């Protein structure tokens, strides 16, 4: 970043030479008062401190008015940074961050706090304590970010949220709209709903962690490459408590409606009913790429109701389950008409199945260079149906493409249902005999799949 301090020093020196005394000595008159001079001076101011507007970080005083005054002052000056120093700031209402304004706390990276594990409560740094809106998801978000507005370096903690289920509903913590708003380097410790992105483009959520209880992040009407990077949802606040179980049965880590060219890099969620959910809203559905998108201990790591024709592309992801028999890594619903593709991903359990595909006739699901492990014999399935559904991947609708993958368990690998439109299963390696079951009415290509002998037999033959 360019340093302008030396310029300011020289400028001050020249202004001193041009003082009224010097001008008079040179036979020059000072210019008349400029009515716009005050406005220009205000524009040169780039930083405001909330303490100068009456904010008190004692954990009890309502700071809604003081913060909004500081934010509005920055907005009136056409942008700048509003600083919230160390303190625990309580709020009874909502904040609106105007265009081109940054609300900046003390943290340089997302902090970490826990109540049930380490009793490390959010007592230091810049901590926001919202209290308004309890009892309903409706209503204004706690922090509203307009075009080019930024929230950075804070911890948001709801002090009145209870540890017993069900949790108290609140509106979203952050609403992002317009172009290029951002949430950076922050912790959303225990919101009911975390971040909502809508009606704009180039939104940026980077280096954000926490434990949203109901919905972590919701994206819809994002028309120009919304970006998520290093977003990490983990139950720091209530791990292994009844409320944590409520979250597992009811929560969703990420929800994507209409988002054009979505980018998601190194995202993670743990302990949700659904990790990544893709839906079709009135505005449309999603397409984009998800690299390093991981989900663990979810009933469905990825659930696709529908996606856009141009595909949702997963690469280098890991999907793990610990709660059979309800759980599975991937479920594609019967309304999906788009393409869902996984490359270089790992799926492991224990689980009843890794993937259940029920797509529309024009839907497509593809796996390439993936690893599958730890799917059992589907104990909850009716006995007469187990042969159809107990394979690792059950493909019932749309088309399926499975190439270059590894299946590590000695159980059936793939079932191809009668309503499939097309299937290619080729060049895969199985750590047991090849067991691909088909009831397809259409032609399928199933070839060049290698079944390995049991590992213990291989060791025995080597010893002989």
Show which residues each predicted segment covers.
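Short glycine/acidic-rich loop motifs that flank beta-strands on beta-rich extracellular proteins
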Residues: 79, 92-94, 112-115, 134, ...
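C-terminal segment of N-terminal export signals and the immediately downstream linker at the start
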Residues: 27-52
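N-terminal secretory signal peptides and thylakoid transit peptides that target proteins
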Residues: 2-21
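Feature marks extracellular polysaccharide-active and adherence modules
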Residues: 85, 98, 104-106, 152, ...
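Acidic Gly/Asp/Thr-rich repetitive segments characteristic of extracellular carbohydrate-active
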Residues: 50-85
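Leucine-rich solenoid repeat scaffolds
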Residues: 418-460
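The right-handed parallel beta-helix/beta-solenoid scaffold, focusing on the short coil/turn
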Residues: 80, 87, 93, 99-101, ...
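Extracellular beta-strand-rich solenoid/capping regions of secreted or surface-exposed proteins
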Residues: 68-76, 89-104, 110-152, 157-180, ...
């Amino acid at each position: 970043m360019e340093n302008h301090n030396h310029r300011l020093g020289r400028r001050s020196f020249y202004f001193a030479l041009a003082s009224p005394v010097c001008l008079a000595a040179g036979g020059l008159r000072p210019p008349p008062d400029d009515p716009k001079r005050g406005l220009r001076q205000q524009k040169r101011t780039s930083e405001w401190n909330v303490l100068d507007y009456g904010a008190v970080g004692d954990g009890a005083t309502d700071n809604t008015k003081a913060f909004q005054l500081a934010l509005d002052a920055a907005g009136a000056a056409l942008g700048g940074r509003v600083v919230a120093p160390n303190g625990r700031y309580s709020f009874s209402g909502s904040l609106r961050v105007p265009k081109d304004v940054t609300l900046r706390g003390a943290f340089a990276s997302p902090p970490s706090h826990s109540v049930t594990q380490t009793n490390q409560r959010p007592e230091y740094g810049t901590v926001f304590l919202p209290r308004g809106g309890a009892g309903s998801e409706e209503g204004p978000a706690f922090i509203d970010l307009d075009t080019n507005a930024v929230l950075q370096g804070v911890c948001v903690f709801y002090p009145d949220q209870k540890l017993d289920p069900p949790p108290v509903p609140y509106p979203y913590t952050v609403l992002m709209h317009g172009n290029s708003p951002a949430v950076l380097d922050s912790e959303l410790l225990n919101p009911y709903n975390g971040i909502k992105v809508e009606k704009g483009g180039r939104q940026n959520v980077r280096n954000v962690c926490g434990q949203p209880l109901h919905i972590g992040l919701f994206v819809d009407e994002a028309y120009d490459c919304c970006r998520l990077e290093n977003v990490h949802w983990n139950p720091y606040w209530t791990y292994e408590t009844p409320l944590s179980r409520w979250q597992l049965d009811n929560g969703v880590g990420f929800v994507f409606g209409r988002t054009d060219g979505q980018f998601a890099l190194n995202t993670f969620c743990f302990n949700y009913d659904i990790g990544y959910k893709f839906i079709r809203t009135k505005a449309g559905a999603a397409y984009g790429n998800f690299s390093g998108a991981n989900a663990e201990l979810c009933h469905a790591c990825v659930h696709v109701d529908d996606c856009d024709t141009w595909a949702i592309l997963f690469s280098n992801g890991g999907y793990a389950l610990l709660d059979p028999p309800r759980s599975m890594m991937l479920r594609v619903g019967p309304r999906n008409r788009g393409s869902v593709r996984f490359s270089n991903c790992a799926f492991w359990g224990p689980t009843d199945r890794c993937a259940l595909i029920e797509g529309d006739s024009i839907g497509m699901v593809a796996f390439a260079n993936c690893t599958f492990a730890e799917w059992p014999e589907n104990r909850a399935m009716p006995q007469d149906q187990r042969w159809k559904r107990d394979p690792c991947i059950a493909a019932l609708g749309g088309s399926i493409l499975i190439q270059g993958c590894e299946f590590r368990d000695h159980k059936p690998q793939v079932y191809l249902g009668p309503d499939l439109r097309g299937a290619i299963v080729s060049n895969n390696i199985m750590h047991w005999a090849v067991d691909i079951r088909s009831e397809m009415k259409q032609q399928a290509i199933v070839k060049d799949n290698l079944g390995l002998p049991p590992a213990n037999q291989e060791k025995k033959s080597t010893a002989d």
